[in-house]
Amino acid sequence: ELSRNEQDEFIIVYLGDDSTDFRLELTYLKNRTEAYDLGEQEFHLALRTVDIGAAHDRHEKMGCICFENHGMGIYFIEDPDGYWIEIIPDRTKPITWR
């Protein structure tokens, strides 16, 4: 376990292999009573980029951005099968949207 974020409504745990930058994020929603449905996008792949602005510009031109959260500095793209992929910035650099 690399780190943990515990809030009233959820717990997020980050796992890693201690030899690469790979991180697996596991999210537990505390108040959820029903089973997860894949269509709800609770399970998704996230990719980190060193230049979030350039990545955003490229994805915007491709027309594949399906959700943006500028406050969190993230956005999602949708693949041809309808799955969402989260694009996250390298947190060691300032977030700049073009």
Where are these regions (language model features)?
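Conserved beta-strand termini and adjacent loop/short-helix elements that scaffold enzyme active sites
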Residues: L2-R4, L29, N69
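A short, acidic/glycine-rich surface segment
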Residues: E9-I11, K30-Y36, I95-W97
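Vicinal oxygen chelate
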Residues: D18-T20, E34-W84, P89-I95
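Short amphipathic alpha-helical surface micro-motifs
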Residues: E6-I11, L26-K30, R58-H59
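Core segments of cupin and vicinal oxygen chelate
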Residues: E1-R23
